[in-house]
């Protein structure tokens, strides 16, 4: 009788674990950085702009757009790396004991300066594309747009 109780409890525990585990995996398939169609949004311009974002552009416009985007990525690579480093430094300062409010404030100002510079470069890129007759694709203000407003950004800081 004791063996039967142990076997039943073990089987029920295993079934529960498998049931809840499968449910957790199924719900976690689409994280906050994923589009509804399961594609990664980290380099896209919005939810509906994936592979077909340049479908309405001529071959010349596609080449110009790609060149401008490549130039933007190359020209802002160091700035984006600095921004990442400053964000890590900011988080480290907030978790240090005691918290040095002056250092935190100074780093936050550096972060804001980098963000402003990056945004100005983005505006220049958008202007360059507009002058070439290439409309912006995607959603630049929310959920995955490169301007990262609303839920696509990292929240308030």
UniProtKB/Swiss-Prot annotation:
Residues 1-26 form the signal peptide. Residues 141-157 have a biased composition (Gly residues). Keywords: Periplasm, Signal, Stress response, Zinc. It comes from the Bacteria. Gene3D superfamilies: 1.20.120.1490. It holds the Pfam family Metal_resist. GO terms for cellular component: periplasmic space. The keyword Transmembrane helix does not apply. It is found in: Periplasm. Residues 136-157 are annotated as: Disordered. Disulfide bonds: none annotated. Its main location: periplasm. Belongs to the ZraP family. Part of the Zra signaling pathway, an envelope stress response (ESR) system composed of the periplasmic accessory protein ZraP, the histidine kinase ZraS and the transcriptional regulator ZraR. The ZraPSR system contributes to antibiotic resistance and is important for membrane integrity in the presence of membrane-targeting biocides. ZraP acts as a modulator which has both a regulatory and a chaperone function. The zinc-bound form of ZraP modulates the response of the ZraPSR system by inhibiting the expression of the zra genes, probably by interacting with ZraS. This is Signaling pathway modulator ZraP. The gene is zraP.
